[in-house]
Amino acid sequence: MSFLAVQWHHTNPEDPIWLYSELNNERWEIRKVEVFADGLHDWAEGGRSTGAAQLSREPLPPFEEIAIQPEFTPREISREEFEAVWRKATGNAA
């Protein structure tokens, strides 16, 4: 199990600027939070989601592959940091 935060550098308000993922050992997303520039949070888990958030349809690439893409700045985060973002995004929904 690992946790990832990825800052997405762009100017399109329709897309999130932060992507938070909980990953299993094969790098499949278990839970995901998308944070938008206006402060909106969407989330996905299993068959439930808000907004347009969806879990990836394939395993995420290795950290190094994400990091070499100039539009993304990834960092590994702790379970506690992910859970704080998850609680903020889901409120009483999860």
Regions found by a protein language model. Name each.
Residues 1-18:
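Short, extreme N-terminal segment that most often corresponds to the first beta-strand
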Residues 8, 33, 53, 71-77:
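Alpha-helical interaction segments
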Residues 9-11, 26, 38, 80:
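Generic structural motif
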Residues 20-22:
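Active-site microenvironments that recognize anionic phosphate/pyrophosphate groups
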Residues 24-68:
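Acidic, aromatic-enriched beta-alpha/helix-loop junctions
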Residues 58-94:
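Short, compact, well-ordered microdomains
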